[in-house]
Amino acid sequence: EYVDSLLTGSGSDLDNSTFKFMDPGTGRTIGIRADMTPQCARIDAHILGRKGVSRLCYAGSCLHARPMHPLASREPVVAGVELFGASGIEADAEIMTLAVRTLKKLGIDVVHIDIGHMAILHALMGERISDESVHGVVRALRMKDPVALAEAAVGFDPEVQQALQLLLRTFGDVSVLDILERELPQKSEIQAALREVRELANICGADEVSVDFCDVHGYQYLTGITFSVNIPNYAQAVLRGGRYDGVGLAFGRSRPACGFTVYLRALAGLQVAASHHPQAVVARGPLARDLEAQVEKLRDEGHIVVRLLPGERDEDVLEQFVITKELVRTSLGFELKAL
């Protein structure tokens, strides 16, 4: 799409990740989407135009000019959800619990969720949040580099410098919120954000919860809760989400919004669902009209039926399915035989 609609209101992170080229027909710059959220925001603003809450989902491929990390694919296949029109913690809870349930369905037995809140950084930075000087602060927070953070925060108020260093070194389980509530500036926005994190950590349904306010990706458009899920032996998050109120403002309709994206290629590469093969019925025998009709009848009833081809073995089927029944011919027709 033309970049003026593809990137509007999304911040420099997405701009830097977007492949761009010149349209020879118009001379305008075209980009290939690196994220699907801006497109969803435009759909909510212009195509749907609902006054109430909109719940949307999507799946598709994106293209990154720069990979998210050295081992990442530059063509991630993603799926996700967006909830527009609700600003309360209840909407955040709906999205986070859905994220946890999604990963459980995909076969991840122990879900570890990492929670942050962008309102804290926004409250500390104030109007500086859109300045170039903040890039160094954000980079240092991401790297958890106290020396680089001190250099980047030169000129900031001493209270802000101390608060940033506190965020950098204070992360872990939910108990660290006690320290942050006590030692961070007593601004109402900061204390409210810490309370939200505590409540969401309690109700999101994850097996393990940690708190880290240095995960500040997308700080230019994220406005509230942020969360990510990591799994063992994988370097990057397989799911990211958060709140980004006002993402549709550039399309003429500012709406509160939250959602998440799950990176399917990462999960497929780890074969996390391999131990959860679906159950199936196996049907064998030469071509016959009555046999094919019975196979179709079982499929219409909701059964997965694998019609064995010549030379195909049961062992081949077991790589994808758990065979629980076999369709066998009897003197009275067909019946399902348990295996």
Where are these regions (language model features)?
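Short terminal or interdomain "cap/linker" segment that borders an active site or interface and mediates
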Residues: 118-153
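Glycine-rich loop at the start of a catalytic domain that most often binds anionic cofactors/ligands
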Residues: 4-21
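A conserved hydrophobic position in a structured secondary element of the catalytic/binding core
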Residues: 32, 116, 262
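Short, conserved phosphate-binding/catalytic loop or strand-edge motifs used
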Residues: 75-79, 115-123
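Hydrophobic alpha-helical transmembrane segments in multi-pass integral membrane proteins
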Residues: 29-36
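Positively charged, Gly/Ser-enriched RNA/tRNA-binding surfaces
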Residues: 2-3, 16, 37-50, 56-108, ...
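Short acidic, glycine-rich loop/turn motifs
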Residues: 21-25, 231-233
